Amino acid sequence: MNKLKKIGLTALAGSMVATAATAADVTVGASWSLSYTGQDSDENGGAASWTMGDSVTFTTTGELDNGWTATAYYELDDDEMDDQKLTLNMGDMGTVVFGDGAAGGFGIDNVKNFVPTADSPIFSVGLTMLAYTGGAGTTGNLAYKLAVGDTGVTVGAEQEVDAAGGYSRSMSIKYDNADAGFSFGLGTSELAPDNGSGGNTETAVGASYTMGAFKIGGNHNETDYGSTATNDVDNQHYGVSYAVNDDLTISYGVGNNSKDTAANDEEVVQMAASYSMGSISFGGYIGKQSSVGGTAGDDDITKHISMSVAF
């Protein structure tokens, strides 16, 4: 028996010696950013706040013997582990991502917003009757993306185990033609199928077109709830941006949010600008919400400005 143990240990040691580690590069990143957001609101009389970037990222990337690339990404946000993501880029065979707290972004997330902006997306200003379409969630998310040759077509899918049981799934297809300056995409999600009311579905369709310094884009997104107690919501979002020069960009966007039982549609209008000066970047927007939550007369104005430094 002792001889058998010795042979087994010797074989194990030999296999360990024969295993070669993959060379990898480790990158540590941190953000330098300061922002101010102020809000004049009919509901609360106004609010304002200063915030700063507080995340540190660790990224490890290595190339395998067969040419594939493996990446591990971790983010510490406000002194806590926030996002973790493993990526395996298999070249022509596609890319696989598993994220805990970080979605792959290959499902409906990839096509939910074609609208150009010089700063934050318009749905970050408002749309209080519903958050924008979100796909399969961010906890235990498994995603896959494949570029179909040189056609400009990319297909993607992702899923996660839903807390109510079953799987939440999201899929998308996107077409990009850089020479024509045209992009188009559509996606769908089936969420919480075992929540007792048949689950929820999301759809998104959008397109954008670039002509010189101008870019225009639009999206139509819908969320349909299986529960009759929750109202379905439609979002329409469109806008235009103009690159004045290599450093300055301005944009204008409009978002409309309608809910089945709301008396009025909620509308958000945003004007934004961004400016770069070497390693320093400035950005900001002014956004106005009308009929917040579908209630006439409830209006908000939000002002945001930020400064960031690239290391």
Residue ranges and their predicted role:
Residues 1-311:
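Outer-membrane beta-barrel proteins
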